């Protein structure tokens, strides 16, 4: 994009040292969910950094999640990569994002790259973590939207359908507005 548009800038920041400091300060290795909590902290450090630069430049932070990620499986960190001001592609299925990218002339290596959240110190992909590809999850999401249930499928289709439903249920709290405790009027005075 930088080569095509004069108003596009990029900065490379190595946040590893900052993350290591956070990890040293807060990590409780004996806790069962320590690894996931640290991975989510890495995502939130990225968000903090993006908002720092957005604030410096009076910009908004744009999300990169598509409909399958954001509303199908909820595969993002709350107040991390999900902490954005606008979500320009959140109403598009992954296949639609790829089609638009092709139309825009985006490099095919980017279009076909295996999605990864980059939160771990290894090469695991989103598919490794979820147990299904985005093509499979998109299929399952469409089937669910069409009123299908687990009993309509067998084999891998049933497995993928259940993966989508399981992730969706576990991550539903990310997909709905923050609950507000409504205080009765007689208690406010």
Predicted ranges, named:
Residues 1-18, 24-41, 48-68, 72-189:
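ATP/NTP-dependent adenylation/nucleotidyl-transfer catalytic domains that generate, transfer
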């Amino acid at each position: 994009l930088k080569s095509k548009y004069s108003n596009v800038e990029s900065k490379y920041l190595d946040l590893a040292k900052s993350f290591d400091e956070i990890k040293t300060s807060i990590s409780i290795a004996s806790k069962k969910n320590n690894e996931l909590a640290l991975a989510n902290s890495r995502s939130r450090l990225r968000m903090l950094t993006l908002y720092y630069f957005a604030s410096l430049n009076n910009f908004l932070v744009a999300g990169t999640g598509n409909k399958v990620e954001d509303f199908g499986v909820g595969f993002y960190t709350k107040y991390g990569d999900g902490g954005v001001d606008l979500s320009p592609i959140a109403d598009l299925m992954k296949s639609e994002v790829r089609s638009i990218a092709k139309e825009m002339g985006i490099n095919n290596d980017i279009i076909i790259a295996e999605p990864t959240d980059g939160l771990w110190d290894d090469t695991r992909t989103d598919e490794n973590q979820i147990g299904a590809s985005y093509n499979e999850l998109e299929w399952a999401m469409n089937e669910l939207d069409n009123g299908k249930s687990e009993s309509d499928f067998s084999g891998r289709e049933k497995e993928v359908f259940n993966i989508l439903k399981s992730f969706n249920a576990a991550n539903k709290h990310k997909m709905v507005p923050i609950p507000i405790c409504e205080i009765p009027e007689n208690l406010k005075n």
